[in-house]
Structures are given as structure tokens and as C-alpha cells.
Amino acid sequence: MSEELQPVFSIERLYVKDLSLEVPHAPQIFLEQGDPEVDMRVSTGSQKLEDGYYDVDVTVTVTAKLDNERTMFLNEVTQSGIFRLENIPEEDVQLLLGVACPNILFPYAREAVSGTVTRAGFPPVLLAPINFEAIYQQQQEAEAAGA
């Protein structure tokens, strides 16, 4: 009697791959008044490391500008994780890498952005949650339309 292999999905390691903050107009920018316009961009990526192990990245770039021209700060964080995925069908692996893993990583990236910006002397930046499932579906639809 053969044993059925059980699916495995686990977090092996969470880490910050890259973290940068630029305040190009310091210290003058701290004396200026106004409500900044904050722009956030998010991207994800993954790569296979070895059998069953994947490195997944969520990169968050936040730019704050005064009067839509003077940059207050530019903060970029790449939060990464090594995930173990075994005995999982390939279509489910892609879904886990594109949705589940980014959902796990994003709160860590959000905290890194907020903490870095606060330590730089600015008010905290509170980033709204991201619907990675909707992003994944859009990517799948775009790939299907291009095929």
C-alpha cells in the first residue's frame, strides 16, 4: 500500500532584501508646509531556488511630493520570503506564489515602510491592503489574451 504524498506549504524564512530611503531636499523640506501627495507602487516576483523552494518578493515604492513637484521622500522596500512548496499541482503553485505568498509578505513590507518613514522624521505612512488575488487574475487574463 503506497502512502499518498501530502502537500507542503511552509514559510522557511522572511527577510528584507532591499531597503532604501531618499530625502533629497533635507533639511529644508522639514520647514515646508502642505499636505503631500503620496504615490505607492507594488510589484511582485518569484524564482525557484531548488526543488520545492521558492524566493518570493514584494517590492513597495512610496513617493511623497509637495505641490506635486518637490520630493519629500522616496522609500523602497523589497520584502522577501523563502517558501517551501511540495506535492502541489503546478497551477496551484503559481497561485500560491502570486497570491498567498505576497499576502503573507505585504504586512511586513508595510511595517518596514511606515517604520523607515517615521524614523526619517515624517508622519507614518499607512498603506492600504492590496488585493493580490485581483492582480493575479488580471495578469492571467492579460496572458490569456496575448496567447
From Swiss-Prot:
Primary localization: cytoplasm
Subcellular location: Cytoplasm
SUPFAM superfamilies in alphabetical order: SecB-like
GO biological process: protein folding; protein tetramerization; protein transport
Database matches in Pfam families: SecB
Transmembrane segments: none
GO molecular-function terms, A-Z: unfolded protein binding
Gene (UniProt): secB
Key word Cytoplasm present: yes
Keyword annotations of the record: Chaperone, Cytoplasm, Protein transport, Translocation, Transport
InterPro entries: SecB, SecB-like_sf
Coiled coil: none
Natural source organism: Neisseria gonorrhoeae (strain ATCC 700825 / FA 1090)
UniProt function note: One of the proteins required for the normal export of preproteins out of the cell cytoplasm. It is a molecular chaperone that binds to a subset of precursor proteins, maintaining them in a translocation-competent state. It also specifically binds to its receptor SecA.
Alphabetized NCBIfam families for the sequence: PRK05751.1-5, secB
Family the entry assigns: Belongs to the SecB family.
UniProt lineage: Bacteria, Pseudomonadati, Pseudomonadota, Betaproteobacteria, Neisseriales
Protein name: Protein-export protein SecB
Subunit organization: Homotetramer, a dimer of dimers. One homotetramer interacts with 1 SecA dimer.
